[in-house]
């Protein structure tokens, strides 16, 4: 994979050295009369991993400069790498082979220096999340972690010295639907009281205040949302054990329906005939 720099003058990319990695064979049996084995380097438990590194090269050509990320490259994964907007720096996430420690580096593509700004740990296992959005003119960013026992979104300063909880509460954030820096909110799905029901909540990105429930309280069940980029509108889906899925376009601020897209009326009639209890 590769990433263009914000100014389009450089490319940061991964290089994978698969020497010594065992071969796994996939079978291609779809485009000819006879199947063909396709060799693919693929490590198994306890065997050698690929050695992966991240480098930077000018878009005009020339030599690649490599980041000297600490640690054995065959026992660590450079799982994520992205340019920080409007800068010559990249953020690199380094996951150990046990996948319970995520070390976050900021690398300067001019000097090739590295700074560890954050290390997230778990006794068992860490998921890699793609919920990073830069805020406050790249002075801070959002970060997903289970550090307090719940899956929550945090606001972290660029130097990693400050970390503030955004989605405060005794619940897991099931899904991040929209991070809206302009409006100052993050919208997410959670089930604080009943795991069979999912609702949309929002919390302030500055970490102040309590979580606000966006979904109507009088509609118990499963809610899902596809939110517009400006967080003003959404495609809202609702269903429960006795209500077939109902889909509509809504004003997200008021949750007022703008247009009904699908109400599954025929199915709702058939379900009503069954006389199921609520």
Residue ranges and their predicted role:
Residues 52-59, 105-112, 155-159, 201-206, ...:
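Beta-propeller blade signature
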Residues 1-13:
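Hydrophobic or amphipathic alpha-helical targeting/insertion segments
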Residues 1-2, 30-51, 56, 126-140, ...:
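Surface-exposed acidic, glycine/proline-enriched linker/cap segments
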Residues 7-9, 86-88, 137-139, 182-184, ...:
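Short coil/turn segments that connect the beta-strands within blades of beta-propeller domains
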Residues 12-16, 21-24, 50-53, 67, ...:
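Non-catalytic accessory segments flanking enzyme active sites
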Residues 135-154, 180-182:
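Loop/turn-rich, solvent-exposed surfaces of beta-rich toroidal or solenoidal domains
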Residues 59-70:
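A short helix->beta-strand "capping" segment at the edge of beta-propeller domains
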